[in-house]
């Protein structure tokens, strides 16, 4: 009798590696590092998903309370700029993937706070691993701004890799 693969094994979905991207050099480094270490030789054990959290125009302008005079004119301009930035971020990430011969990539741009968008996308794709770049903020700046990577490390329901860009020596 011929041996056949277990049908459960052949139909098992490929695990997902999710990489959070933004316009920073730290994000670009984290994506490049991920591609070099997990997606070389045109094969990988993972499906690649990239997510960019696009802030809303109101959060970017800081309009949490009553709208000030002139906001109606400014918000569409800010929103247009944020959409252009998001398109550039997504395109640059896609180009880097293509350069590294990774063509089967999903890129999502989602409006919202980066921490929530990233953790929600982990859940949506049932990611096994989340990769985020480290901006290398000091303790005070991290305490004031909050760290997206720290938040994700504590709230994402998967393994989280924080990729630090090596400091250049002078």
Label each region the model flagged:
Residues 109-117:
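Charged docking surfaces used in two-component/phosphorelay signaling
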Residues 79, 83-91:
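Short, surface-exposed alpha-helical segments at coil->helix boundaries
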Residues 32, 95, 150:
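Active-site phosphate/pyrophosphate- and oxyanion-stabilizing loops and adjacent acidic/basic residues
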Residues 3-75, 83, 98-105:
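Small/aliphatic-rich secondary-structure junction motif
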Residues 104-107, 160:
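Generic structural signal for residues in well-ordered beta-strands
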Residues 57-59, 116, 169:
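Flexible, glycine-rich phosphate/dinucleotide-binding loops
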Residues 1-7, 120-170:
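Gly/Ser-rich helix-loop-strand patches that form or flank binding pockets
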């Amino acid at each position: 009798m011929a041996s056949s693969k277990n049908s459960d094994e052949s139909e098992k979905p490929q695990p997902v590696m999710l990489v959070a991207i933004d316009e920073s050099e730290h994000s670009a480094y984290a994506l490049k590092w991920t591609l070099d270490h997990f997606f070389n030789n045109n094969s990988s054990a993972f499906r690649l998903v990239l997510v960019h959290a696009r802030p809303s125009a109101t959060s970017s302008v800081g309009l949490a309370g009553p709208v000030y005079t002139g906001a109606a004119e400014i918000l569409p301009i800010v929103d247009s700029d944020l959409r252009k930035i998001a398109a550039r971020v997504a395109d640059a990430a896609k180009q880097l993937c293509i350069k590294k011969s990774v063509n089967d990539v999903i890129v999502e741009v989602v409006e919202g706070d980066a921490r929530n968008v990233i953790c929600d996308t982990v859940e949506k794709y049932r990611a096994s691993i989340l990769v985020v770049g480290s901006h290398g903020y000091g303790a005070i700046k991290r305490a004031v701004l909050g760290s997206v990577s720290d938040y994700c490390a504590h709230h994402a329901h998967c393994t989280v890799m924080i990729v630090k860009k090596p400091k250049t020596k002078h």
